[in-house]
């Protein structure tokens, strides 16, 4: 699966979590926080490529990006690119 996320799409971190959970079919128990994000991303078993465009380099969204990159280091099925 290929997914492009544009940082300008999300007015807040909750919108991001809801959108990503929907797109990647995260389980109902997904807690919409950074720990849950990491857990769900490292559990992905299908090849998944996520491209981050216009991504904020500070604040909550920057922390999300770091968590996604950390998860990609642990999961060979996940690739994160920042444009």
Predicted features by range, described:
Residues 1-83:
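Positively charged, polar, low-complexity stretches
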């Amino acid at each position: 699966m290929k997914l492009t996320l544009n940082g300008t799409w999300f007015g807040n971190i909750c919108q991001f979590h809801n959108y990503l959970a929907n797109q990647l079919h995260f389980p109902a128990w997904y807690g919409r926080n950074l720990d849950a994000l990491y857990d769900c991303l490292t559990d992905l078993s299908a090849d998944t490529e996520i491209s981050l465009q216009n991504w904020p380099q500070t604040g909550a969204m920057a922390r999300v990006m770091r968590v996604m990159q950390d998860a990609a280091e642990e999961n060979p099925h996940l690739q994160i690119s920042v444009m």
